[in-house]
Amino acid sequence: METPGLPGPSEAAAAQRKVLLVSSFVLPHAGGVEQFVDTAKELLRARACRVRILACRLPGGSGDADALLPSWFVPPGGWPLPVGGWRTLWREIGEADVIIANGARHLLPALAVLVARLRRKRVLFVLHGSGAPFTKSSFFYHRLLGSVFEWLVARPALRLSMPVSLSRAGVAGARARYGVEATYLPYPLRELPRPKRARSLVANEPLEIVWVGRLYPEKDPLSAVAVVEQVRRSRDARLEFYGEGILADALERLARDRPWVSVRGSRSWAQIQKVQGAAHLCLSTSSRDATQIGILEPLSRGIPVVSTRVGDAPRHYVVPGLRMFCVEPGDIDAAAATILVLTAAYDRHRDEFAANGRLLKARHRRGRAYLAALVEPPPPPHRRSTSIRPGDRLVLGNQPTHVP
């Protein structure tokens, strides 16, 4: 029997599916949402799809994409604005079978949706956000212009495509913020390296903490400094930041008077895995987030993580005894106290995180099959199957479907 939404033997033998991933960025910031593009590319190519990437041309002319559009980057945050390359956009979309538009807050993915509809192509629109408001961002850029962009650009584009959310929080957020129903796709984790050894913590050993992500207000890296500063009142600790963004200079200024703070800049995905695997724990201080890939990957590897309770973060702590390590955003005292609880019985909690990682990895492994299913052509409507588990949510045609 064949499963609706999943490729069958006859479909697997068919010609390669041509998938075009459209994203303003490919890998601009360590830990940024754009990491999905590279992940999706590798997973779909492993499933015999022919994948191309269309992106904005970065300053300097480089970019890890097959086709690039000339673009301006609007200060202060570098919002990408394509200013040319329309023939390239038209050609790339015309040659693809399926378009995956990545990110609802940028113009290029929305333009790709409009062109794809003109060219009668199937479009999947990947949502990364949780729908939570921007409480720490510029009033003019994020709250005023952002709202105008959502109403005039993002909402129409989402209604012309099939929205796909990489987080449970994003499903509810898409309904509340954009008025659309999104299909939930468990984040398709790539193969994660195992930590080389189980890290222990000696009584007088400095606690090594790693923070990975975009250095922007909504990620709140400045709070991480305050948290570790409070931890240091009880034991020695060091904090390393990996990422890029508009708060890099502010962190550098803080680091001048705090030799235990290091701002390392951006690194490759493989390098980040090594850094996280060598640390005692990873820290996330986001005030708004969705998938929380910056903690999902280390948690899936069994690495201890202290995080804020935003987006899907609470769901990543599968083992009940670990949920105390997920605290309210902005609560410096709670985060510091939780880190000290972790260090007081580090070996025991480390083993619990290892068990949690196995459960979390199994949960997100199915995201690979779901991603492949999304780009396959829908099966004929008369096909039926009894092999789908209750609660699965797959795709038929251009609309999500709930499987009873």
Question: For the regions a protein language model found, what residue spans apply to each?
Answer:
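Conserved donor-binding/catalytic core segment of Leloir-type glycosyltransferases
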Residues: 20-22, 189, 200-219, 225-228, ...
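Short alpha-helical donor nucleotide-sugar binding micro-motif in glycosyltransferases
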Residues: 93, 266, 274-279
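Aromatic "clamp/platform" in nucleotide-sugar-dependent glycosyltransferases that forms part
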Residues: 104, 287
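Membrane-proximal helix-turn-helix segments that form the acceptor-binding/catalytic region
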Residues: 118, 131, 144-162
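Nucleotide-activated donor-binding/catalytic signature segment of Leloir-type glycosyltransferases, i.e.
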Residues: 249-270
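Short hydrophobic beta-strand element within catalytic cores of glycosyltransferases
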Residues: 304-308
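Conserved acidic donor-binding segment of nucleotide-sugar-dependent glycosyltransferases
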Residues: 320-332, 342-346
